[in-house]
Structures are given as C-alpha cells and as structure tokens.
Amino acid sequence: LPGAEPAPVAWDRKVAEFLAFMRRRVTGDYEVDEFGYDRELTDRVLNAPLRPLYSKWFRVETRGLENIPDTGGALIVANHSGTVAIDSLMTSIALLDHHPARRQLRMLGANLVFQTPVVGEYARKTGSTLACAPDAERLLNKGELVGVWPEGFKGVGKPFSERYKLQRFGRGGFVSAALRTKSPIIPCAIVGAEEIYPMISNAKTLARIMGVQNFTITSTIPWLRPLGLEPLPSKWIIEF
C-alpha cells in the first residue's frame, strides 16, 4: 500500500516502543493521578484484550459521538445490563478509540468493585473511582468525562425476560454533582449487552451466603466453570 511502512521497519518501531514502555515501568518513570489512574498502562496493556471484543466479537456500532464535547467535564448516564458489566468497558473503548478527541471515560463504580481483589486494582488503574458525589464532582471540575450506570446491580442482575427494562435508579447523587459543577448530562443507550449472558435465575440465597449482590445462573454460568465466562457474540449499538 502507498505510504505504508515496510514490515521490518514497523516491527522494529514496535519493539523499540515496547522496550521504552518496559523501561519506564521498571524505573517508575510514569504518572498515576490522585485516583490511581495509569493512562499509559491502561491504553497499552489493560485495554488491549477489550479491543478485539469491541470490533470483532460484539461488532460495536457507535452513534452520536458528536454529542460528546471535545473538552470539559460531562456526565454520561447509561443503561446497565449483561450480568457482567462489560457494557461499561465497551463504552470506554468507544470514547477512547473512536471519539475525535480520544476521551477517557472515568467510570463510577460500586463499593463492591473496589473491595474485590484484582478487580478493584484494575478499576483504579483504568480510571474508575467510587460512585459518590465528592469523587464525581472532583472529576467533573477537572474537566473529565464521567460515566455512571445508575441502575447498578439491579441492572445487571435482572432476568433475561426483563431485558431492556430500566430498573430503579439509585439515589441520584450523580445528578446533583452535575448540577453543582454545571456539567452537561448526556444519556447513553446500549443495545446488545443483554444477550451476552442470558440470565435464567438469580440465586439470592447463595448470593447472601457469599456476600455478593447477585449469584447469576445463565445458560453457561456456572455449568461451564471458567469457560462459562466467555460472552456470547451479539451485535451492539452504543448511542449517545
């Protein structure tokens, strides 16, 4: 192709970039913000397995990106579904990879997310923080794009028979945060996530015993054990 780098040159460049990245990690020459967000690690490593899911497995079609400002604080409010909160991760990839300004979505998560080993650290590294008004206001005042899924565990814990029916929102602290910071509220609709883990039942007794919000039973979870966590392919639309 005209203008394309020769394969050996492109490979050498990638190797050099990787070695430079590893050198920065070893020497500590990288930045982490006050919330624990590590931009370089997120973009180069943590988002890498999500991109094939976005483009190939879910074939995400993103609409309405022109409604997202290039700069300044704004609050994205989306529906929540899919048993496992992959919808939030796909929304983040949509904004980072496909918005002209490559905007990073700073997601607000429940307490349980940050209390869970590995998951909590991953969430912090990718820019998420606790779903509370003070943190939301601090991010909005800094000009960040903040994402919230106000249905919370009720959204991801509903049976397949209630797919695409909005559940009761939380207390609405995110609205007051947007009002106090004079930030626009941008609705986001996600279609396709309901089909990736069709829920048959929610074993609430087991959930209480294990100290979690939901113990989901789907056509593959827990029957196939770790393999059951592989989401079913579906066509997604994310519209702002």
Feature locations, PLM:
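Membrane-anchoring hydrophobic helices of lipid-metabolizing enzymes
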Residues: 2-105, 109-134, 203
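A cross-family acyltransferase "interaction/gating" segment
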Residues: 28, 162-240
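Short beta-strand segments
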Residues: 77, 149-150, 189
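Active-site-proximal segments of catalytic enzyme domains
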Residues: 113, 143, 147, 152-159
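Short acidic, glycine/proline-rich loop/turn micro-motifs
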Residues: 120, 158-162
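Hydrophobic/aromatic ligand-binding patch that stacks against planar heteroaromatic rings
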Residues: 122, 138, 176-180
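Positions that flank functional sites
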Residues: 138, 154-155, 192-194
